[in-house]
Every structure is written in structure tokens, then in C-alpha cells.
Amino acid sequence: MANHSQLGFQDASSPIMEELVEFHDHALMVALAICSLVLYLLTLMLTQKLSSNTVDAQEVELIWTILPAIVLVLLALPSLQILYMMDEIEEPDLTLKAIGHQWYWSYEYTDFKDLSFDSYMTPTTDLPQGHFRLLEVDHRIVIPMESPIRIIITADDVLHSWAVPTLGVKTDAIPGRLNQTSFITTRPGVFYGQCSEICGANHSYMPIVVESTPLKHFETWSSLLSS
């Protein structure tokens, strides 16, 4: 959960998000090195410690061709690795289906016979003390932690987007199309997200709440809900 005046990312709760945070730091260091080099050269030029009347320097042209190529390789390799990791779906222990509506989500646990529900935002007037405004729902998604989860995402009316930042998940929900993604939660907890595609007047009132629990707790919850 993000805190007031927080400058960094939320704590990663999935391997993919951990990789994304590391890649962000890596890219930031590369950008910092480039800025430092440019500022250093500008300082030398402005203090006249580095000046030249040379109008042709093939060595310089070679340097400003090779250095950007090296920078692009340093950014492209980890980026491609993460892209492949995000597209790779392991054999899931559990499959969910999320359907976006104006303006709520409905969920189906396809591995269970009768386990489905709608998830609406909890109105501020009904919000228990200590809960988060505009982020709480009447029915949370409950999943077992440290288990590969596949989620199939679609929409019933207009474009939506199912996103939970701390899990590193953001997938568009498109009417007539099934998109899928996967994730693994690395710790127990409650993770919040929202619809991330403008979908109408109440777009801001489509929160997503994922509760990661030990397997025994999930089995108890699923048996109670499906009975």
C-alpha cells in the first residue's frame, strides 16, 4: 500500500514486480551516468578548459556512435528478459476469470463448480474505521500465496484494465477478447489496485482487492463460499 508523500515504489509482492523495480533502478543509473557525462563536458566547455577549432573529428563521431549503442544494449537486454518473463505462464495452481463492468468487477474461480461473485466498491458511508476510502470492496479476491495464479481478463461493456501495482500486474479488459496474465504472491497480505483504463463517469470507483493467504486458509474460505 502506498503511503503519503512516498517517493519510491510500493513494496514488491511478486517476483515480476521485484524484477521491474530492479530494472527501474538500473535504467535510472544509466540515465544518471549519461547526465553526469554531459554536465561534465558542458562544464569543461564553459570554463574553456576544453575547446577546439577542429571541424572534422572522426574519432569523436566514432565515440558518439558506439557509446549510444552500448547504452541501448544495457537497457534492451534486461528489458527483453522481463518482457519474456511477463509473457511466460507457468502451470497454474489456480485460474481466475475477471470481468469488467461499468462500474464493478465480477470474478469466477474456474477450478470450482459454483464459486463466483461480484465485487463492488464499499461506499464511504459504510466504510469501517481504519479502512481505505475508494479502495475497499465488499468481496475480495482470495488466493493462496506462493502458488502460480493465472487470471483471464475480459470486459462486458467498454474497455477496462485490471491492475495491481504491488504485484506488477496490469492487463487490459477488452469486450469480446480474453487476455491472460499470471503472478505469484511471495507473502501474505492485502494488495490494492484499481481499473486503469478510463471507462466512464465512475471509472475511479472500480477498486481491486487481492488477499493472499496460506493454502489452508484459502481452502477454508473457498469451501465456505462455494457451499
From Swiss-Prot:
Gene3D superfamilies per record: 1.10.287.90, Cupredoxins - blue copper proteins (2.60.40.420)
Ligand binding (Cu cation A1): 160, 195, 199, 206
Highest taxon above the source species: Eukaryota
Cofactor: Cu cation
PROSITE patterns named among the record's database cross-references: COX2 (PS00078), COX2_CUA (PS50857), COX2_TM (PS50999)
Family from the record: Belongs to the cytochrome c oxidase subunit 2 family.
Name of the protein this chain belongs to: Cytochrome c oxidase subunit 2
Organism field: Coturnix japonica
